[in-house]
From Swiss-Prot:
Membrane topology: Multi-pass membrane protein
SUPFAM superfamilies in UniProt: Family A G protein-coupled receptor-like
Homology family: Belongs to the G-protein coupled receptor 1 family.
Single biological process term from Gene Ontology: neuropeptide signaling pathway
Region (Disordered): 451-513
Single GO molecular function: G protein-coupled receptor activity
Extracellular topological segments: 1-31, 91-106, 170-188, 328-338
Gene: GPR149
Function: Orphan receptor.
Residues exposed to the Cytoplasmic side: 53-69, 128-148, 210-306, 360-723
Name recorded for this polypeptide: Probable G-protein coupled receptor 149
GO cellular component terms listed in the entry, alphabetical order: neuron projection; plasma membrane
């Protein structure tokens, strides 16, 4: 084979006289060149489509973020790289040598886009690290940040161009290679390029270590379902809108990923809550502090940071083999055609990953819980988080996926001198503290019963009175008349077998599910300030609770009733000698068969109830199981009532047989059998059954306490409207 003066063989393969031996197998060389040509063509076509798609998508964005501007410039670099690749394909296919000006131009453009991409990868990582960890300096307007970033991008292009024209000034030169044209490996200019790349690589490595944890190391399930929330410090529950006011501390999810969203809301850091898109949609309510569109933009912006980090890491790492090959060939003179070809193809692949960033808006849930899962399955549940930790637990019931774990802390109760409540975290937006009515004795009595202003509008203009009013097929609950150490108000109404009027007024933990039960409402009011409270206005023992929804099948004629209880004691922890437990809260969910249905038919057998289990957080004993028993009143007293027990070991509710006892039990076991707590309350199911019959017979018949309270609410509202 003859060698041309331009060091090109007839098939276009370059040879360097001092450093390279002449190929003895031209057929294999031609085969490798065909493979190289086909691979280059496929990658180049992919880069062309991807860069056009990225540019069009990014330029169509109305609100361009700083990161999207950098990625737009990367798409321009990818589009520019198509020019030298096309020239390289001509070199690989043709047996003629390229003119030196064309070879120099293609090598310069190829090196320019490579240096520019690596520098911009470092810029992306630096900006992400700066914006996340320096939140106090991010108060400047978005327009100023965009202008600064434009100058940074222009500076990178200028620096990259200056580096690439150095061979034209005499330092090194561009010569043909086996795959196209590149710099002469014998020149010290190669070392300069390697130093520039090493600086970018080192900066990217140092900053990406903390960013990887902050942006990628999380569990999306924990984001969409906030399992553990601390109400006393202003944390929200799943499906709960924020109520921001001077009397209400701001809500903020406890989540390592959400903490990194601080830079999005510096102006409202103390008055706004970050809502995940799924939570905002499942609640059916628009947060008061920010609309869904803004919350969506926050989530998309955070996803852009995730994918931009992946994009920067991929681009810089794919250029690493090329840089290693250049330095090794410069120092040792060793050349491997296969490794050199592979390095070239990897640099082309670096230009194909840019469109992944555009898909970040559609892949918000990735890569959390997919690529890296660093979920911590433990939660601090005591008032001092570093002291007492219980094993975290969660549950998914058969037909439901909505759940929440709550904590009521001793520090959560604050009230001012005029008797107004200053802490309220509930599912209805609290815009003002509770103010006792100025009416007569009846109104004064109601002041101890109500935990929220009945005149205050609810989620969709629904007043508290309306939401507390029982429906034809269910009971609604609110505070009992007796004072409590911590008022936790639960409203649960079962619109079972019926269409609830205005379903948008209801809340549900289950996305896309037609709400049939309202979620629990947590609120602290004046009724808590009782002599049983310790000095500081707090619970003697903070309470933990988890709740869920379970579906049961009940034939017509049965009535279901569920009660939940809170427990408290005078000591700071439960001991065998201090076992006096006071039950001061209960609520029921009733279900009556439709009286219009034929008594001989089985109609409306689907019954849905809420279960809520409470445990004492400061109890140092490990709890194996927490049980709440719900009995079903049967038409025949001979049939035993099914009950449910939640087992944390089995992570589910299991059915248990309680015999013929008609009562509700809350069992809190401990390691010491003598210190087990077993609370038994007489069943109220029979009262529901009797009441459901009398409701249709006489309007002034037997009424339960909750119905009388609802009646008082309605009378109070009517008096307010008349005044």
């Amino acid at each position: 084979m003859s060698v041309m003066p331009s060091n090109l063989s007839l098939n276009g393969t370059s040879f360097f006289a001092e450093n390279h031996s002449i190929m003895d197998k031209p057929n294999e060389q031609r085969t490798l060149n065909v493979f190289l040509f086909c691979s280059t063509f496929i990658i180049a076509f992919t880069v062309l489509l991807g860069s056009i798609y990225s540019l069009v998508s990014l330029l169509k964005l109305q609100n361009k973020s700083t990161i999207s501007m950098i990625v737009t410039s990367l798409s321009i670099d990818d589009l520019i790289s198509i020019v030298p690749v096309i020239i390289f394909m001509l070199t690989q296919w043709s047996s003629d040598a390229l003119p030196q000006p064309l070879c120099t131009t293609s090598a310069l453009i190829y090196l320019f886009q490579g240096i520019s991409s690596n520098l911009k990868g470092s810029l992306i990582v630096s900006y992400n690290f700066y914006s996340i960890n320096k939140t106090e300096t991010m108060n400047c307007s978005a327009s100023k940040r965009r202008v600064s970033m434009v100058w940074a991008i222009l500076s990178i292009w200028i620096v990259s161009l200056l580096i690439c024209i150095l061979p034209l000034c005499g330092w090194g030169k561009y010569i043909p290679t086996t795959w196209g044209c590149f710099t002469d490996h014998a020149s010290s200019y190669i070392l300069f390029l390697f130093i520039v790349y090493s600086l970018c690589f080192c900066l990217l490595t140092v900053l990406s270590v903390p960013l990887t944890y902050q942006l990628l190391c999380s569990d999306e399930q924990q984001l969409l379902h906030v399992n553990y929330q601390e109400i006393s410090r202003g944390y929200i529950t799943p499906g709960t809108p924020a109520g921001c006011s001077t009397a209400t501390p701001c809500l903020s999810p406890v989540d390592p990923v959400d903490k990194t969203l601080k830079h999005f809301q510096n102006a409202c850091l103390s008055s706004k809550a970050v809502f995940r898109k799924g939570v905002a949609e499942s609640s059916g309510l628009e947060p008061r502090c920010m609309n869904n569109a803004k919350s969506r933009s926050f989530t998309v912006g955070f996803a852009q940071k995730r994918f931009s980090l992946i994009l920067a890491l991929t681009k810089v790492i794919l250029w690493l083999p090329m840089m290693i090959q250049m330095v090794v060939q410069h120092i040792t003179g060793y050349q491997s055609f296969s490794f050199e070809t592979l390095s070239f193809l990897l640099t082309l692949l670096a230009a194909t990953v840019t469109p992944v960033f555009v898909l970040s808006e559609h892949w918000i849930h990735l890569p959390c819980g997919c690529i890296i899962n660093c979920r911590r399955n433990s939660y601090a549940v005591s008032s001092e988080e570093l002291k007492t930790k219980h094993r975290g637990f969660e549950f998914n019931l058969s037909f439901q996926h909505g759940y929440g774990i709550y904590r009521i802390s001793p520090e959560s109760h604050h009230h001012d001198g005029d008797g107004k409540s200053t802490s309220c975290h509930n599912l209805l937006v609290c815009e003002k503290p509770y103010e006792p009515p100025r009416g007569g004795g009846g109104g004064a009595a109601l002041a101890e019963l109500s935990t929220t202003d009945s005149a205050r509008p609810g989620p969709a203009g629904l007043s508290a009175t309306d939401s507390a009013r029982p429906g034809p097929a269910g009971f609604s609950t609110t505070d009992s008349a007796r004072p409590s150490a911590a008022g936790v108000r639960g409203e649960a109404a079962s619109g079972l077998g019926r269409t609830v009027e205005g379903p948008e007024r209801r809340l549900s933990h289950e996305e896309g599910h037609k709400p049939e039960l309202t979620d629990w409402e947590w609120c602290r009011s004046k009724s808590e300030r009782t002599p049983r409270q310790r000095s500081g206005g707090a619970l003697a023992i903070p309470l933990c609770a988890f709740q869920g929804t379970v579906s049961l099948q009940a034939p017509t004629g049965k009535t279901l009733s569920l009660s939940t209880y809170e427990v408290s004691t005078e000591g700071q922890k439960i001991t065998p000698t201090s076992k006096k437990i006071e039950v001061y809260r209960s609520k029921s969910v009733g279900h009556d068969p439709n009286p219009e249905e034929c008594p001989n038919t089985f109609a409306d057998t689907s019954v849905k109830i809420h279960l809520e289990v409470l445990e004492i957080c400061d109890n140092e004993e490990a709890l194996d199981t927490v049980s709440i028993i719900s009995n079903i009143s049967q038409s025949s007293t001979q049939v035993r009532s099914p009950s449910l027990r939640y087992s944390r070991k089995e992570n589910r509710f299991v059915s248990c047989d309680l015999g013929e006892t008609a009562s509700y039990s809350l069992f809190i076991p401990s390691n010491n059998p003598d210190s087990d707590i077993n609370i038994t309350i007489p069943d109220t199911v029979e009262a529901h059954r009797q009441n459901s019959k009398k409701q249709h017979m006489e309007r002034g018949g037997y009424q339960e306490e909750i119905q009388m309270l609802n009646k008082a609410y309605r009378k109070r509202e009517e008096d307010g409207n008349s005044n």
